[in-house]
A protein has these predicted regions:
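Bacterial Sec-dependent N-terminal signal peptides
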Residues: 1-23
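Beta-lactamase-like hydrolase cores
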Residues: 20-64, 124, 129-133
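Short Pro/Gly-enriched beta-strand edge/turn motifs at strand-loop
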Residues: 27-29, 203-212, 410-417
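Conserved serine DD-peptidase/penicillin-binding transpeptidase domain
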Residues: 34, 82-351, 469-470
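Small-residue-rich helix-loop
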Residues: 56-58, 306, 316-471
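Short active-site loop at a secondary-structure junction
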Residues: 58-78, 82
Length: 471
């Protein structure tokens, strides 16, 4: 009798599940057929009940789409599993030769570990470490070791005209201030040139200030650089009527790092010639001075919450070292090998059926299916060593990151944790939510061929609200 009762109870639960799934299917189908956005564009959706272990809904889930930044889900989950949550990015200072009477008779080395969070304060610590080592002058070379990666500073399929935007820096194992400068322009007295402040301070870039304060006839304020010629002259022109800020990338991040390091050393009273800067591989026998360490979680948080491309590419390059062949001069191809191996062995998908060429989703050559992205979300959920860090780093609806301005009301508020994605023609969302019945749900939504991302985001938010109502 007890066995029969158990079977009946199971059948009752299963019937309830099927009923809820049918209701969800009907509601989503109705939304897809009625939304005017989908008359001129496409959408693909896949939804999975992690608690019940069942797929709830799919629509074009096996078709290939450009993922935009939800590809960072692939990079982040792979990095947490392969590198581990205790991994650290390292920038190391060392020397060879001897220090006699304050003079380093040898070379000073900075070995880059692709730390995307290395800022001006970190460089100040490098300068202090040199001084504390008793070095007042260098008779040899000031060496930047960027041997971690090859010389290709942009990914395959990146748009050349995205430069000089900050979201597309020139990649290097030595990155200072994310390869960018922060510019602040303020009005001065009427008719006078605006006040321009640029950080970090360096002699690597120049300023051409042609702005005029409080003078509308001067035209719209423009802040740019001579990027078409790979120049690093910051050009400010037009009318300055209020405080304006902009962040621009600089050409050749490794040179920006080393030139600024040399500049700061000299500013602190050390004697170092700019002509002594070289880019070589540091020998294993150098004497250690200092190491700047960055936890992987700090990099993951910016990659996911802020959808930061540099952070994702830094993770991608570190994964490339796990290619099993070599740990230096890492190429995008080396990184793709590791991504593909993990996809096959851990996720259970054939990498030959997809195309992933970078770590950030910037490339227009990336093609994945929604079901593939869902498989990474589900894998993370099943592995506690990956999930908690990954989940904590995702944007929270209405609260922070790229979801701060979305889903600020309703049941989705503070419930949805998901990675957003936006490139021209693409808007995507992938993550987790908890339905009213307490079940944890994973989902992926990709809108393709959309001219106005705002309309796609509105549809995605509606879908999230529908999923939360699942009972």
């Amino acid at each position: 009798m007890k066995r029969i009762s158990g079977v009946l109870f199971f059948l009752f639960l299963w019937a309830g599940f099927l009923h809820a799934q049918t209701l969800l299917t009907n509601e989503l189908n109705k939304l897809i057929s009625s939304d005017p956005l989908l008359k001129t564009s496409e959408v693909c959706i896949v939804v999975h009940d992690l608690t019940a272990g069942k797929e709830l809904y799919s629509y074009q889930a096996d078709k290939l789409y450009r993922p935009a930044s939800i590809e960072k889900v692939v990079t982040a989950v792979t990095a947490l599993d392969v590198l581990g949550k205790d991994f650290q990015f390292q920038t190391t200072l060392s020397y060879d030769g001897v220090v006699e009477k304050g003079i380093l008779k040898g070379n000073l080395y900075v070995k880059g570990g692709f730390d995307p969070e290395f800022m001006e304060l970190d460089m100040d610590f490098l300068v202090r470490a040199v001084k504390e080592a008793g070095i007042q002058a260098i008779s040899g070379k000031l060496v930047g070791d960027v041997s971690l990666m090859d010389s290709i500073y942009w990914g395959e399929g990146w748009s050349w005209d995205d430069t000089p935007e900050a979201f597309q820096p020139y990649l290097s194992p030595l990155m200072l201030n994310r390869g960018c400068v922060d510019i602040k322009v303020s009005p001065a007295a009427k008719g006078k040139a605006g006040t321009v402040e640029i950080t970090p301070e360096s002699d690597y870039y120049q300023l051409n200030n042609r702005s005029i304060s409080l003078h509308p006839e001067a035209g719209k304020l423009k802040i740019t650089r001579d990027w078409l010629t790979n120049g690093n002259t910051i050009d400010v022109s037009g009318c300055v009527s209020s405080v304006r800020k902009r962040t621009l990338n600089l050409y050749d991040s490794k040179r920006f790092f080393m030139d600024t390091f040399c500049y700061k050393l000299n500013k602190e009273g050390l004697s170092v010639s700019k002509d002594s800067i070289f880019f070589l591989t540091a020998p294993d026998s150098t004497q250690w001075i200092y190491t700047c360490r960055r936890p992987v979680e700090e990099v993951l948080k910016r990659a996911l919450k802020e959808s930061d491309n540099l952070s994702a590419e830094a993770l991608f390059r570190q994964l490339g070292q796990m290619n099993g062949k070599h740990t230096s001069h890492i190429s995008f191809g080396d990184c793709q090998v590791v991504i593909g191996r993990f996809m096959r062995n851990a996720i259970g998908h054939d990498p030959k059926e997809y195309r992933i060429v970078d770590g950030s989703g910037v490339s227009l050559y990336n093609y994945v299916s929604p079901r593939l992205i869902l498989a990474y979300l589900n894998y993370a959920y099943r592995h506690p060593s990956v999930f908690q860090t990954f989940y904590d780093c995702l944007p929270v609806a209405g609260v922070d990151g790229t979801l701060q301005g979305r889903m600020r009301t309703g049941k989705a508020f503070r419930n949805v944790r998901a990675k957003t994605g936006t490139v021209t023609g693409i808007s995507s969302l992938a993550g987790y939510l908890t339905s009213v019945n307490g079940h944890k749900i994973s989902f992926v939504i990709i809108n393709q061929n959309v001219l106005k991302a705002r309309q796609a985001r509105k549809l995605q938010d509606k879908i999230c609200e529908l999923l939360i109502q699942l009972n």
